[in-house]
Amino acid sequence: ITRVDVKTITIASGVQAKTLDNVYLGQLPKRCIIGFVDSRAFNGNIQRNPYNFAHFNHNFLCLYVDSVQIPSKPLTPDFSKNQYIRSYHSLFDGCGLNFTDAGNCISRSDYPHGFCLSAFDLTADLSCNDSHWNIIEI
């Protein structure tokens, strides 16, 4: 059984830093995918694309699960200098596509232009895409 849980969190424009505490209460997901969307598109403006995941020049992203930072070194992209390969590579790590002969249909050059998603595998053995069961963390 696979469950998809979508969380929506609003970050006001112009905010320089944002810390979100206790985003998940109860059972932790196996995987967390983070994307940023313009609020006008999210709220239904038909001139905007709600699937345009822009980077908004963010320059630091990481998660903490039980006081453990994921990934161990935060993602620090610099989109103005085209230095975002670790963020792009998180799509492969976080979706279980690393070290496989499979892709995700998002090229490195397309990533900052509407496909800026970051994925994190939250399982203890980094097996969110495998078929075996993991201990459920609460």
What do the predicted segments below correspond to?
Residues 1-138:
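Flexible assembly/topogenesis modules
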